[in-house]
Amino acid sequence: MNFILAVFAIILLQAVRGEIDNAIVGDPSVECGDDFFEVNIYHSCSCVGNFIIKVKFDTRTTFHGLAFVQNHLDNPDCRSFASKTDSAKNSSLRLTFDQCAIEKRHSTSPRGLFLSTNVVVAFNPEFLTKNDRVFKVQCFYMEMERRIQKVIQISMPPPTMHSKQLNMPVCKYEVLDGSPTGPPVYFATVGQMVYHKWTCDTEHENTFCMLVHSCFVDDGNGQRVQLLNDKGCALDKYLLTNLEYPTDLMAGREAHVYKYADRDNMYFDCQISITVKEPGLDYCDVPSCPDPPRRRRSNTLPAPDDNITAIAAHIEYEDSEIISDYIIPNDDIISLNWLQRNFDMRISELCMTAIGTTLLVFLNAFLFIISLVSIVHVCCFRTSPKLEKTKSTML
């Protein structure tokens, strides 16, 4: 009995040893096909097939193991089956694109598609041994680019550029006396009726439209009041009402002169937008504005003697208060004579025009010359008697 067991053990060890001693001889070769992967394990066999990938290698002895995709042994579609006969010389593993998580990777340089997977070759179907191998099987399918070119030489005349640039209108702002045709006003009294006029001149008629907006009045020291908003609508009817547009490139409105307390100069700052007139329109669109409200009245009255203000054609502002009761009717304004217009005496300063300043300079120069001549004459008169007295003594 013991003899039989010993013989059986020797036969079993020889069988196991034969499985373990089997190994792959040389380097496997890989061929890529069209539709699927197929991994063939041959024993000294060279075969040809129409497969995506075909791996061929030689083993020392007959192959009784199996081949499978790594990490997919439990999937029947991802492994080969062990041969049940001793006469089997090979085993095959057939894989399609959508099975066993075959990796697909696009390449841009070179352009194409990589298909790759890991195949484990086990010589024993039950366990792995040191003779087993893992192969990374990879196929590259290159994209072919064929560029078909045909040169056609066409001679065309160069395009002729016809361009014409319209000159933009030249705009100006004026403060006139009483009406759109009145003379310019540079010095005015509070309550005087003036006409604010914006005009633009252009060589091309019926081409442009204008919009006066964003108007401010400034005292020169940062105190600003807004008269027109960005749409061209008035904000205070006692300062300036909504503008009239008699023509496409003219806007204006009459208003009474007002001033800041303790300030003699006022600076007006407005923006004028020029747009191209729409074809077919007889008139330009003008802003549709509601009646402007009245601002809150100030508690500070201007000084009684500060009744003359200078107007400058500049443009900018912030909120200030004007008292409508301080506006003087136009009929009550008294015309100034020549001396009042050119020599305006005030408490804190002397304001004169260029003519008055010139006359004052000439007058001072004349008085200086008269004084100098008088001094020289007096000095000469006092020296003459002394000279005569000296001559008589010498005699």
Swiss-Prot record:
It is found in: Cell membrane. Pfam families: CUT_C, CUT_N. Residues 380-395 are cytoplasmic. Residues 19-358 are extracellular. GO terms for cellular component: plasma membrane. The keyword Iron-sulfur does not apply. Disruption phenotype: RNAi-mediated knockdown results in disrupted alae formation in L1 and dauer stage larvae with alae often present on only one side of the larvae. It is a single-pass type I membrane protein. Residues 1-18 form the signal peptide. Residues 46-291 form the ZP domain. Disulfide bonds: none annotated. Keywords: Cell membrane, Cuticle, Glycoprotein, Membrane, Signal, Transmembrane, Transmembrane helix. The keyword Membrane applies. InterPro entries: CUT_N (IPR056953), Cuticlin (IPR051962), ZP_dom (IPR001507). The chain crosses the membrane at residues 359-379. Glycans are attached at N90, N307. GO terms for molecular function: structural constituent of cuticle. Plays a role in alae formation in L1 and dauer stage larvae. This is Cuticlin-5. The gene is cut-5.
